[in-house]
Amino acid sequence: MFRRMTVSLMVGMLAASAVWADTPKPFPKFEAKRVKPPKPGSTNRINVFIEPKADDVPEVVATESGAIVPASPGQYDWFWDRVSPAVEKSGPGRLEAAMVTLATASSKIPAPRMQQMQEIAKANGIDILRSTIGTQVSPALVLAVITVESAGRPDAISGAGAQGLMQLMPDTATRFGVTDSMVPMQNIAGGVKYLDWLMGEFDRDPILVLAGYNAGEGSVHKHAGVPPFAETRDYVPKVLAAFQVAKGLCQTPPELISDGCVFAAMN
């Protein structure tokens, strides 16, 4: 019997030890510490440090001569070596010089495929023609802008918030009466109105008009010409290259960005 009691006692102790092993240790004892307010005139304060946020890196820098140049070069800086970005050189006649530059330069700007632009014209040609009636904007220019801006996708949305075929920013859309930028007809109408306004603002200068469409007319005025942003400096020749292709889709190719055009094929 004594042996049975001993065995039972040992089993009980082992079971108890297993329970104790699974029991977590108590939390350490914490005591609240009262901090007295500083005495009047004391300089001791609780300081909270927030890591300062770096300012945005400027997109332009000044040279020793005082000229403002892009902080990062664009892909087509050679274009601007031959076509002045300055507003003092503006005028509608600059289109010919710009197109000659594109055609004769050793470096080429990739132009959209004619088939791609033809498909965009088939899908949106009627809306483009309707929107450009009575304006200073060639349908061929609108087609070029649409191709470069959205590749013809009516649902395109940029990281900056530009929307639709002609990539209208919300403020620009509101400014020109667009209530839904995702509706192609409205988007095209708003984009054409903006281009038409820019044509009047910059005396039909194709270089400044396209720069204003990309960067805003305020930036063009601020920099007295094409803003020295790599994106804008690349955008202008890209649209002009697309305009050259778009001209070939017109029954009568336009000479200026204000000339009329009827696309050979439309839905």
Annotate each language-model stretch with its function.
Residues I146-A151, G190-Y194, R204-A230, Y235-L240, ...:
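Acidic helix/loop microenvironments that form the catalytic cleft of cell-wall polysaccharide enzymes
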Residues F2-M10, L14-T135, P139-L143, P237-N267:
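Cell-wall glycan-active module
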Residues A111-E119, D127-I133, R153-G159, T174-P184, ...:
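Second-shell loop/turn segments in exported
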Residues A140-L143, Q163, L208:
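Structural motif
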Residues A156-V178, G190-L195, M199, A211, ...:
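Substrate-binding/active-site groove segments that recognize
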